[in-house]
Amino acid sequence: LSAYAGKYICDSDLSAEKKTAMIKELYDRTLGMIEGQTIDTDGKFDTLDGLLSMYEMKTSELLTAASVMGCIAAGADEEKISAARAYAHDVGLAFQIVDDILDVTSTVEELGKPIGSDAQQEKTTSVTLLGLDKARELAKKYTEGAEKALSAFENNEFLCRLTDLLLNRKN
């Protein structure tokens, strides 16, 4: 997937400077995502910090690449790029925490896949570390952080709605 994104960037009409910055961002975030996926294969964490660090690498890194590369392509300033990083970080963590919650609260029909798979694989999740209510609170905190980061952008209504949908999704 990253190779296709890189080819698309190289074939674009963007300046060489923007292409270089975007390829570097894609490269750095792809390495982080691969590291997160590798760490996730063990699936056991003693602390919430360790779990969230893996979630950052596994999910937030990829969202960061997309968000930052969009900003670079649009010619955004450093303030907006920083806000995009903050948004992607928080929305990625919220997404993963909601995924943990759905694994114990959803149905096969709603989720479209077997539920309880994390427990069957003996994976540590935000729910196993915090309990369901605290995991929901943490997902809400990260969702609010993501929405706050979006305040740096004009016409952010769509992304705010999307962020809320991610928190309240059923699958």
Language-model regions: role of each:
Residues K170-N171:
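Short cytosolic juxtamembrane segments of multi-pass membrane proteins
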